[in-house]
């Protein structure tokens, strides 16, 4: 028949039902909907529809119970498989079978005198034809089951008698039935008053029946009836109303009767005690608590119950023994218990039991069975009694045994056997309810928990009582008592109960565990039949629980376990720790939780253990590994909690194990490279334990750290404790003080010395030895090695590593003096080594794919590790060693890593730890066997491989970028040597800086994934790796590092290592302490986590900052020179970092990714404390002007970008030269170069954005480079070559940084600590944002006007300033408080504030280019937060936010595309941030520049100019362009928002945790965005990072991004506005221009000239033209700036913009954005300001709202609007349509929608955006891939041209390619990737491909690996970069799609994503993970890698993904 429901959906629903049932939950509609939507992205309405249809089809079974509907699989209904024969044994599959008759026939047929066995009965019945026909072959198993049930029921009803295994008919049943009742009471001895009853007064009786209100004259039946009156209250009732039998009435009248209200227990005589547990005797109606009964009862007895006082004494031991035997039997086979004892007695006692009085509403607990059942009941009861099975206490009892015995047995049976209730047939059970409502009430309760409530006295006092009572009555003899006690003991022993049940009703009250018998502290939810037992027996190895010792003994014979079912990850002496995965060993973990609950009062987790890892501590002996305790932690914890639950068994308490576990949890956190914190809130005990631990750890850390200055970040890094906990502990220790506007850590030497003295006196019995840990963060994806190293360093190698690292550093040339930095460096190096080798190793496709997939699957696990400590260490090692031995690393992946380890070891013993850690992590697959033999290689290697996969991906990506890349190997090595030295120095710096950040704050839990990613990115170590580390970690790391770096940088180059730490300690400490409470923690957190991220981001930003600061100080002497040097350093850092990943990519990206607004000055300059903020902007503006003079003099914002043609050429040259030179430099002086490169990259990119245009930036960047003079030549060369490259690299680094920062911010949100940071960030950022915006507005205005004049001066100043602030947190600080920047202290303070925010932003802007991703993300996160607040202030933008949220979603993907652009935008933002004025004016141009400016002039133009010629195709292309190049700024904005929201998804979602969590949609957007938006976010962050970054991170990022997206995807309006700019810009890259307009759906960016006219547009023009990313920024700026003219500038500026607005609700948001723009910052400045502000303004309000508002409806609306126009041309529409949800999301700016994105989102510029930075950083090829990405992302991300954008992406990519000359080859590849011709609308096919891929994973498209492939090196770099960038969005998408993360992501992000994008996120997720996993590794170099980009992103952004 035709099915009504879609069979696929039905299958999904059945899967969901199975999944829900597996979770031990009821398959309700809600749960089914959630499960289906999380797995398949199907919306709720559809699921419910299909569910109903499936029910109608009969394919799903609907079960209603108590008004609740459940759904079951009819083929696998679970318990309802067979309609349970509830009616008197009559149950059978065929209703025709009457089991009673069948059984009778069987017994009669068999005629066995002794009885028949079950088997013989079954055989006999099966031989009967009618039976075999009815229950034929298929029903055989069912037949056996039904037969057993029927027999059991018959025994229960008394129709059969059971003697052992034999059953026989009960012939007396019928006759007995009748007699039973009478016998029961009449045969009982007469009642007499008990001693305590005799002298009690009797109340005056009330002569009215309380029930019927009749008198003794007439009852209900109008018959006269004597009343029974209560002796206490006088209330009376007719016996008939009380349902008393005549016998009972007689007996009651002779006694002192109490009514139900007055009833007291006759044993304990406590009236108030649990009345529910009271039983009423059916003989005397006295009450007894179940615990007070002679044998205490746990369950209400079923039949007639006679108290111990009335029970007849039966003489004869035989009977008792028989009963005891029966009891034993019953226990062995509890099933045999008669179900209704009650009923059996029922009839019998029907009269008597009528006693069940339905009195005043409270039924007598006495059970009356329904008459219908009474016959069988009584019969049953009788039989049971006879049988002893039921130990009836009724009629038969007198015959067979004395009442006491009977009671005892009865009690025992009740006590020990499963309650009859449960087993009773339903029909039979029916009565109970009535029979003893009360009894049952108590019963049920008591059965589980109450039974022993008063037991103790119950047993003892009762026994005495009873003895006394019985004795007094002389009913019982001594012999009886002996018998009783004897039997009781026997019975209790059987059950293992040795004492009376305990009064607290703990169930169970005792457990036997191993050789211990442990009294429990609390009840645990064991199944009822177990929990009601007084004692449970647990297997101490598998933790199974059993009812008796016998069963336990039998189990022990069979149980082969002798240790927990997991990998042993730690062993020292006789102590081991096992890592048990709740998803793998579910039963074990559930049993462990049940056991733990016995000793924990607040534990709530028992059955849902899948998301947790359990670290089980064991003490080992010959027998096995005995459980001592455990702690659990979430695999993917948003808050970075490292302990969820912790428990030590009582017998091991007070022996140091608790501290051991806490210490161990922090060791793991450190290995993950993130600070950890126990899950809040803590229990009182937990608080005590943790406070003691924190105190001791901090005091010991302070004791060992004698630095003058120590910051909380450093403490956090050293200890792994999150900054918030450190702060609270320091506060507790009274070691925090507020002095001169800063918090200072006071060393209380006496306290420290006292503690150490105590410690020496009482050594710890058990201590964690990090050397013994063999573990790679499998699940939590953290920077494993780094933190581990830190910890190990903390643990003792600290000093050695420091010394050795110092050695290294000295060797390195930077010669950092801070061992911590060295340690960090080593960490970084190790990570780098680890990662680099891993990258190399992973280069093998098999490994790659393996790792890629595992990484995908284990994003949290593997990826973070990469990012985690391991990753970081490796990275550092790699940076050091990698820089040194880049070649070696590349060539000898693992061996290199190991060698590097060796190097590290040489450098420091920590290196040994690192080596082990690195080995474990880097070589985890290898070392697995060695280092972690206990951990199954599979898992270890999986994580490591995943980690490596990410590394590999990034390395492959990085390979292009880094010498390690294919092409660059030689260069790399040359550079590697240089990088090695420089790397060491930078590594030192990097590590130093990160170290201090790491030190200060423990590894950031926030985005360990990022870190890991970063390490993976280590090939372009400084650029991308760091970016990525920065991306996730940088937010915090950069914040913290920036803080740390700020001071150190301020100190001097030579002091760089230490000063950084020192300032960090001192100033940062103070700052940190301030920030600590809010921002600082996260920062510190970031610090720690970011070691590498920081290294990357901060190394680029901070390190450069350090170098900058040193250089800045030197730079103060030589402003520009030091600054540029820092840029060089940045670049070197970048190269170091980027060496692995960003190096190549960064150069490419640099060109393309130089945001216009961003000065290309090194971050050092930016960071220069002496610089004035205004100067920064002016410089940038001037530079921009100079640069843009060519294209748009008015738009000085473009300073960063050279004339497109120039830039293209330069980019090409510089890219390649820079790539090589960079690599050389990177390798030669990886540290310095990487730093310089990163600095240069970011600064250069920033400075270059102005400088690029005028070449002044290059000169300037080169100027600073002299400081790194050996690099300077390179830098100069690089500057010319690298300028584009640097622009890209810087952009990329900026992106990374922004991403890092955003991610860190995200991390912050994720972490509570981070959240604090974020809050502070948000607060501060908003403060600073406004300041910045104001600055920007003014400067922006000035900037545009002053651009030409001031740009140079400003650029110098700005470069310095920018370098200073930007490099550290000064960037943000710079803008917000230039003064702060100028003043080291103030700067740091400001940085602290700004650090988070502005560091994010400024880092994004300036150093972001190198680590633009992280930075931008961070910046965006911060900015988003800041601007979110702004947005909140500006309600106008809330709608925009929603739109943006949608756009963000779009742009998540766009983000991937736009990532590079994002860099540019970041650069722009950085510029903005760097110099408020400069930033603003420069922003549009910068933003444009972002995409095209340095690295991608042509591309920029191309990007920007995509729209005019593209037509519909053009639109997508242009959108793509915009998305990519043009969108660089918008894209960046997009990305920024998305990064924040999406790229930040990790960060954003977490950073935006407040927002994201507030808005599922936001998270969605974050998730989706993250999917593609992570990059976008990062990119966006760089663009949006300005102001968008902060709030964009969450909202603003979204807004900006969305604006960009809107402008790009949804609202061409931005692009329209931008279009003029685009056209202008397009002028350089013609293709781009053509492609771009349609993309933008804005008029082509001809308005470049209008820049001044349209403030928003001029910048947009510049942005659009120079950098397609500006479209969004343009849009935003246009909207923001134009909004001043037309508030809805996006809408008004071009109709197209408005249509996009209409298309996407986002545009409305953008309207708000224009409002933000209204905060007009004149000219470009206004644009940027608005841009920044928009993020803030939008950020706050809109982020949450956009997410929420945008959700599916809006997104779909947007998508549809946009999708239709553009998708159609390519059949994107279909593709989009197919991914309707995705598309919808895409449309709305659902960059998050990976599926959508690949198709529609692609046009958005996510990938595109990414490409610019990537391209800029890497090569044009890189850019091309990025553009490809953009294409993909653009298609996906940009709603209005989304579909077209698929086409456009090609163009965009091509544009990007155009922008960077080398890109063309990549372009070809890209286009090939997309199946398009490189230049023109090759993208057309691309969109389709994208469309196809979209379903797959836009990541592929997003990460145009083909471009990477094309230019192996460049592409790789780009891939790495792109991957990296893409990875962030993709990572989030990966995060969602990540197999491992898929679940988690799906948990809330995905669902949110779903909410936001329909099922896009889901589609994307599944698709992305696979494509990611496969593609990513499959084509590290190609778009497969791009798809893998998601994975690479995962790998690179693994941490994000993890997030």
Curated annotation (Swiss-Prot):
- What molecular functions are annotated in GO for this chain? chromatin binding; DNA binding; histone H3K14 acetyltransferase activity; histone H3K9 acetyltransferase activity; histone H4K5 acetyltransferase activity; zinc ion binding
InterPro entries the record matches:
Acyl_CoA_acyltransferase, HAT_MYST-type, Histone_H1/H5_H15, MYST_HAT, SAMD1-like_WH, WH-like_DNA-bd_sf, WH_DNA-bd_sf, Zf-MYST
For the region Required for nuclear localization, give the residue spans: 52-166
Q: Domain named H15: which ranges?
A: 95-171
Q: Which residues carry this modification: Phosphothreonine?
A: 369
Q: Where is the composition biased (Basic residues)?
A: 866-875, 1009-1030, 1148-1174
Reaction catalysed by this enzyme:
L-lysyl-[protein] + acetyl-CoA = N(6)-acetyl-L-lysyl-[protein] + CoA + H(+)
Compositionally biased residues, Polar residues: 445-458, 1136-1147, 1502-1523, 1550-1568
Q: Where in the cell is it found?
A: Nucleus; Nucleus, Nucleolus; Nucleus, Nucleoplasm; Nucleus, PML body
**Could you say which residues bind acetyl-CoA here?**
644-648, 653-659, 683
Q: Where is this region: Interaction with RUNX1-1?
A: 312-663
Instruction: Spell out the residue ranges making up region: Required for activation of RUNX1-1.
Output: 1-144
Q: Where do the segments described as Catalytic lie?
A: 487-777
What Pfam families does the database record attribute to this sequence? MOZ_SAS, PHD, SAMD1_WH, zf-MYST
Task: Report biased composition (Acidic residues) as residue ranges.
Answer: 786-798, 1043-1053, 1065-1079, 1107-1120, 1230-1241, 1282-1299
The MYST-type HAT domain extends over 503-777
**Stretches for region Interaction with PML:** 144-663, 1511-1740
Q: Which positions does the record annotate as the modified residue Phosphotyrosine? A: 901
Instruction: Please list the GO biological process terms of this entry.
Output: aorta morphogenesis; cellular senescence; embryonic hemopoiesis; face morphogenesis; heart morphogenesis; myeloid cell differentiation; negative regulation of DNA-templated transcription; nucleosome assembly
- Family per record: Belongs to the MYST (SAS/MOZ) family.
**What does the UniProt function comment say about this protein?**
Histone acetyltransferase that acetylates lysine residues in histone H3 and histone H4 (in vitro). Component of the MOZ/MORF complex which has a histone H3 acetyltransferase activity. May act as a transcriptional coactivator for RUNX1 and RUNX2. Acetylates p53/TP53 at 'Lys-120' and 'Lys-382' and controls its transcriptional activity via association with PML.
Q: What is this protein called?
A: Histone acetyltransferase KAT6A
Q: What organism is this sequence from?
A: Mus musculus (Mouse)
**The gene coding this protein:** Kat6a
